[in-house]
Amino acid sequence: EKIHDARSNNVHSVRIDQTYRGIVLKPEQGDLYMLMWVDKHDEAYDWARRHDCAIHPVTGAIQVIDISYIKPASEPVVVDKPKLFAAYTAEQILALGVPPVFIEQVMALVDTVGLNQLESVMPAEAWEPLHWLAEGLDYQEVLEEFNEHRNEPVDTNDFIEAIERSKRRFHVVENEQELLQMLNAPLEKWRVFLHPSQRKLVESPANGPVRVLGGAGTGKTVVAMHRARWLSQRLADKPGKKVLFTTFTRNLAADIRANLQRLCSREEMARIEVVNIDAWMSEQLKRHGYDFRVVYDSDEGRRKCWNYALQQVPAELGLPENFYSEEWQRIVQPNAVYSREEYLKVSRIGRGTALSRIQRAKIWPVFEEFRAQMARAKLREMGDAMHEAIILFKEKQVQLPYSSIVVDEAQDIGAPAFTLIRSLVPESPNDLFIVGDGHQRIYRNKVVLGQCGINVRGRRSKKLKINYRTTEETRQFAVGLLTGVKVDNLDGETDSSNDYLSLLHGEKPMITYASDFKEEAATIIKQIQALLANDVRSQDICITARTKHAYERYASALNDAGIETYNLGQDSGDSDQRPGVRMATMHRIKGLEFQYVFLAGINDGVVPEAKAISSDDPVEQRDALFNERALLHVAATRAVKGLFVSSYGVPSTLLTVH
């Protein structure tokens, strides 16, 4: 039935059952029904009286506004403070999508406090551009981001056309089957849901490599997965061609593969190969007759080779042994330095100890001997193996099936890997799609993409600015852990963590301190029992600690209290169906999310881990400390609804500073 005293014309109520009513807008033009609200009878009618639904005259988007929050015009009050948006005209503010009824209020704002008070009452797509203007972003950049239809004529009565411009807030259900699919979709489907505001980024053809930055929770991995699917769809008429989707760890590759299988059809998935880059390269080298075993630092054979090499250390320089391992990892390997002459010339920017050419000449025999020992043992480190893979593929004219490569967690992938990735596909449209965030770099790999032959400057660089996972309160806590730290943008420039925000709000993270482990564990158990009593599933809760040994202690305490746990090991996946509070290291939960996260044992000497920041080189120590801070930042941003942080004994300096 029609609601005659509704704020908007042509508003009707639909009876759902004896209690609930739906509020539906039926515009005069077109065969369109817009479900606006569902509530109990009286509340639904009250909502219809308070809310106006109109088409914005400039952006053409449909906006729903609660008119009870609009302040009536009043006599101007003389205020000494300058206006927040004094640099812009009312027409410019209107062009950003601000509803006409809010223009006067917005132009009168004097600070961000007043602006933040409008967040809950203005349409999100109207408030966000104002937030970015207040943060200092260029007006034209904000306009292009939020008003892509600015040059198109707008008919404020044509709701069917307006729907096409409003996909961020509205979805057109074409038939009953689609509606049922949406209503019955499992949680896993929503986890790979692409926000409509990101669809343009996913589906826009590119003339070359694209880099996408964004803070934790902004949907980078979801964007990457949808990009892979879009690229796969374009290969339907190109038999044998594939999309390579690569990430840094085996765990993340397994999680992404599982999510892509939920997102893609069987045919689309058959054209996407999801891999951990190290494992992929090792397999390819074996297939093409590579005669060396690829090893990591922990390998015993590699350790013996290194100890032999240290016998070449020039005692007169007085440098500690860890200087040589850091020099190898930070300078020699990433820059593919293979000769004394190359080492004398290579840039050492970022190292704390300056070296003359004479000192470099004395140091080089250590690295030369190490490579000789590794060659005798038929061993190769990953960096050398990647460099040799490029040469081998070229010499053997290896034809790989990939037309495009999608790279996730790019901040943890080093220069050797990116140089290899660049060599795997020819420079062409849609060749590379790279997503990452320097604020989440938890491994000691740093890259400047331009030095790897990957040009992402200018319009080839995009940034996601809305956090869809965590609350603003959790985001602020996590960002605060990195206060005062300069973070790179994967291409040698600085990236900010202040230009993204969360639209969700909740409780501030709960931080507790205990005198000993027993007291801390008891507090955690009590908090988890309260969550379980409120119908939170055990598998939606995760306790994470710095090390495996640490989280196993908490698991034991929970088990003793009758709470089931499930360990997320290095090579184990996470089945959402299996009950049990998830237990994991902070490294393991990278890329995952949980409704509630407990950061446990955040003690002095544990986070940051003492041995991780023990370098004698002040620059190395600074970088290692950043990795530890980033690790805590990453762990905190896994929480969707609530974050709990606890310590016992002396708390971590990261908590006290925070």
Language model: regions and residue ranges:
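A short, surface-exposed loop/turn module that caps and links secondary-structure elements
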Residues: 1-15, 575
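Enriched for short, Lys/Arg-rich terminal
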Residues: 12-133, 145
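A short, compositionally biased micro-patch
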Residues: 15-19, 27, 467, 592, ...
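Accessory/regulatory regions of helicases
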Residues: 64-94, 98-105, 110-111, 125, ...
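ATP-hydrolysis module of ASCE/P-loop NTPase motor domains
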Residues: 76-133, 289-359
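Interdomain "pre-motor" coupling segment immediately N-terminal to P-loop NTPase/helicase cores
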Residues: 115-174
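Accessory N-terminal region flanking or inserted into the helicase ATPase core
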Residues: 157-196, 203, 213, 319-403
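Conserved helicase motor core of SF1/SF2 NTP-dependent helicases
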Residues: 191, 195-242, 248-293, 356-359, ...
